[in-house]
């Protein structure tokens, strides 16, 4: 149809956010990108994502008389926390349980030990990022050259790691990953460990 194209619809949070705050933070992130491009800092985008046995795109080429049947499995899942740079560097951890503040703090503590220059991590306003425990660690990390930059509410498009999660879920994980939990673990691990090599994103 003229003027239309077939594509996946996305949910939008634009109506809920503060436009002025969004534009301010967007400008600050652009400044951080320039500092990174000049070599003054490293810049990472952080987030958590959930992976279960229900495929995000249940479409595949199938024989007409042999449809591909996926088990209706629920319950088991994987959670990934990651820090991604525009250079396709990825620091991540996978858990078979939910993340909480203590686990995120441990993850950030591990990350700060391997940075070698002033580093900024961009995070959303998830409760585990804004908890008293997490906020109490910010000064300690700052003293180790790790700074936290919080996004404005309802602004996922400013967090580039959201693109990574979409690519993994909609493009990179093969459909057979959802046949069983072991397959999911193996396929997800392969993608995560090969990001920046076999899999990449041009920002």
Language model features with spans:
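Short functional hotspots at interaction and active-site rims
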Residues: 1-203
């Amino acid at each position: 149809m003229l003027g239309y194209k077939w594509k996946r619809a996305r949910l939008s949070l634009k109506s809920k956010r503060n436009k002025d705050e969004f534009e301010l933070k967007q400008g600050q992130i652009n400044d951080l990108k320039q500092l990174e491009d000049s070599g003054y800092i490293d810049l990472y985008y952080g987030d958590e994502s959930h992976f279960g046995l229900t495929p995000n795109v249940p479409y595949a080429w199938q024989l007409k008389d042999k449809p591909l049947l996926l088990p209706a499995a629920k319950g088991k899942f994987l959670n990934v926390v990651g820090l991604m740079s525009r250079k396709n560097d990825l620091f991540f951890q996978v858990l078979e349980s939910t993340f909480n503040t203590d686990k995120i703090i441990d993850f950030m503590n591990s990350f700060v030990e391997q940075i070698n220059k002033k580093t900024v991590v961009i995070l959303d306003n998830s409760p585990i990022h804004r908890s008293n425990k997490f906020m109490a660690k910010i000064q300690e990390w700052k003293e180790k050259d790790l700074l936290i930059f919080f996004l404005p509410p309802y602004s996922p498009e400013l967090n580039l790691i959201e693109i990574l999660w979409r690519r993994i879920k909609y493009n990179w994980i093969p459909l057979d990953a959802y046949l069983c939990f072991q397959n999911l673990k193996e396929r997800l691990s392969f993608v995560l460990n090969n990001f920046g090599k076999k899999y990449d994103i041009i920002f």
